[in-house]
Amino acid sequence: MSEKIVQLNEEVIKGQLKELVRGSVEETLNGLLEAEAEKLTQAGRYERSEQRQGYRSGHYNRNLMTTAGEVKLHVPRLKGVTFETAIIERYRRRESSVEEALMEMYLAGVSVRRVEDITEALWGCKVSSSTISELNKKAYEHIEQWRNRPLKGGKYPYVYVDGIYLKRNWGGEYENVAILVAIAVNEDGYREVLGAAEGMKEDKESWKEFFQWLRNRGLKGIKLIVGDKCLDMLEAAGEVFPESRYQRCVVHFYRNVFSTIPRTKIKRVALMLKAIHAQENKGAARKKAEAVAEELRNMKLKEASKKICDSIEETLTYMDFPPEHWQKIRTNNVIERLNREIRRRTRVVGTFPDGHSALMLVCARLRHVAGTQWGGKKYMSMKYIEMQEDEAG
């Protein structure tokens, strides 16, 4: 008797399993939306309750792309309470990531057909060429709106500035394009990306236009500008924000000193420099700097000694501010970390067709980071500035 052989269509089974998973995900997410609505209104659908906080007013549909495929969400409409669901918030973040990824592929020179294939592999559905063009246009518009938004953080006591150099191809020739970036700590102690602009090169006119642009959007109340040594930036800041003071990034200052000494002596000199900024007040730091400069002269490191004598004062400005803030305002580390993230992203693109494309991708990344825990977590307590002002007044 011959055995019965059952032939299975693997593709059909895969499709059925995928649809089963997709349906299960859709059902689960809609169940979660209903549960969130019940929790907000403190009552189930059609339930009469004295504790009810709001009323249902039907649903609206919203498509959500998941790893299981596209699902349709039935989002409850509520009256009397605001329905902010974590599911929709995750959708918004995902949508932002998709926009950024599409823009990166576009700027990297990936063909529209290739982008269609990639989106189908990643998100389970093919994005048409017209959709890709529309998304890029939409992304650029969103970024420009975000980039030129009014600054509503009140006063911004601490501002950090830097310039990022990227490559662009202009008529077959490669040249640098500078993107000027500024972030700040607002009066409530939260970090905020103030903005980014194309500077062509870090000259005085570029910095002045950049600072004026920030001021016109609402930047005010600056007490300290932190950045690397750039005379053009300092002159521009002094003209636009004459009430501000300057703190030279201590880390960049150390590197500048290290550039004048043999590598074998860097470790020892680093400890000497750190000892200056470990002092409890500016007077003690100045005395320590004098001693370090003298020791460097004895070590035959005259150029390093001269740099300390000439520039140490601009690295000590932070000591005029609350000690609780010293560690976070004496360096540009807060913006350097952002710059590393930007460079990691822009490295994928390599060379940009123009400065505007470079600016858009930098801003896309800055906007993304600003919307994460980076911008939502308190960075420092500003009560110490208020206490210092009360004591001085």
Predicted regions and their residues:
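Mobile genetic element proteins and their domesticated derivatives, centered on retroelements
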Residues: L33, A68, G80, L102, ...
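RNase H-like nuclease fold core
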Residues: H74-K79, I87-R92, C125-V226, L231, ...
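Conserved beta-strand -> loop -> alpha-helix junction used to position metal-binding or nucleic-acid-contacting
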Residues: L224-L231, A236-M272
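DNA-recognition alpha helix
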Residues: R113-G124
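Short, amphipathic alpha-helical "recognition" segments used to contact nucleic acids or chromatin
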Residues: S97-G109
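Metal-dependent DNA phosphodiester-chemistry modules and their immediately adjacent helices/loops
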Residues: E84, V257-A291
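Acidic/histidine-rich catalytic cores and adjacent linkers
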Residues: S2-K4, A35, Q42, L107, ...
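Short, conserved DNA-binding cores of transcription-related domains
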Residues: M1-E89, K167
